[in-house]
Amino acid sequence: MSWTYKQHEIGDITQFPENTFGFVYMTTHKPTGKSYIGKKVLFHNQKKKLGKKELAALTGVVGRRPSYKLVVKESDWMTYYGSQTDIKKLLVEGKKDEFERTILKCVETKKQLTYFEIKYQMLYQVLEKPDEFFNDNILGKFFTKDLADIVFEDLVVERK
């Protein structure tokens, strides 16, 4: 199953807008209607230990020789559904067909990625609606259980 972005299927990394660092997504479990909002990066920097030949090629280099190199590697974005434990359990049971994956926003930096993840989680009120969302925390700082006793009402802010 591929991702959907602006009503188009995305099945390859070349189909993303140019300079995309990552994206904010919504995974929806169709039978229950529950969703999960999260973020995913497209590339990872991975430390790879230098082999004997690569180390030998560095002889004569002044100063400390590097013992590793950074390798840019594509992430598992194509097969990713979310990090939430309930979603993982459903996937282990072989229920991938029951999920719909939608990209909400593509971004160019790590900071924007975190900002828009939080923005969408707040806009959709993921912590206030535990019957509609799998999300049980935002940033590992705000938790559903901490808001259990609070009655949420629609706030109307009047502007002058």
Mark where each language-model region is.
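GIY-YIG nuclease catalytic motif and its immediate N-terminal context
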Residues: M1-G51, I150-K160
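Short, polar/flexible loop-turn hinges at active-site or ligand-entry regions and domain interfaces
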Residues: V107-E108, L127-D131
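IQ-motif-like calmodulin-binding regions
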Residues: G140-E153
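Conserved short loop/helix modules at catalytic or binding sites
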Residues: K40-K110
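Short, surface-exposed loop/turn motifs at beta-strand boundaries within globular domains
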Residues: E18-T20, G94, K129
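Short arginine-rich
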Residues: K119-K129
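Short, flexible loop/turn segments with low-complexity composition
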Residues: K129-G140
